[in-house]
Amino acid sequence: MVLVIILIVPRDDSSRIPRIDYIAVAEQAAESSKNPIIAPELEKDWWSNQAKWLGNPVDAVPRFEVGFVGPKNEYIGMIQAFGVNPTWLALTLKDVVLEKNFSNQGSEIVWAIHRAPEGNDQPRARDYFWVTTIGENAILLYGTGSEAQFETLSQNIEAKLGVE
């Protein structure tokens, strides 16, 4: 009788990772930090799985971090860091090398694209970075999404920055 009960209990196949209202978190972070936090528009079927403000981290670089998940479980993380110093940036990018620079059509913003050297069996989230600096601040995108997905997200970020 116990076996029959176990077999008829429906299984929940939904994602166990909650969707986060990253826009609300960004608004709260902007209000508390007095920094211009960016909450880019997402493409259809993309959602956020985490968003947080690190106002007083050990490395002394305050930042907003948000993760985005695509319809096929692609992942792109975004770090918007304030008061970035060369050491912090070098440590963050220590496992990747500069591959090329990229600018969206008509944009003044230059994204430095970094990639991990070949050899990893499985792609890791921090094997691929797009980085731009604006004054003493930086925006870093990283993850397993395609180059086209990174390009689209970078365009959406630039739209929030007011860069055309």
Q: Which residues fall in each region the model found?
A:
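Ser/Thr/Pro/Gly-rich low-complexity linker/stalk segments immediately outside membranes or between
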Residues: 12-25
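Hydrophobic membrane-insertion alpha-helices, especially the h-region
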Residues: 1-10
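Short, solvent-exposed recognition patches
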Residues: 24-124
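A short, solvent-exposed beta-edge/loop patch
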Residues: 6, 100-164
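Alpha-helix boundary/capping residues
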Residues: 11, 95-96, 157-160
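Generic surface-pattern signal
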Residues: 9, 30-35, 159-162
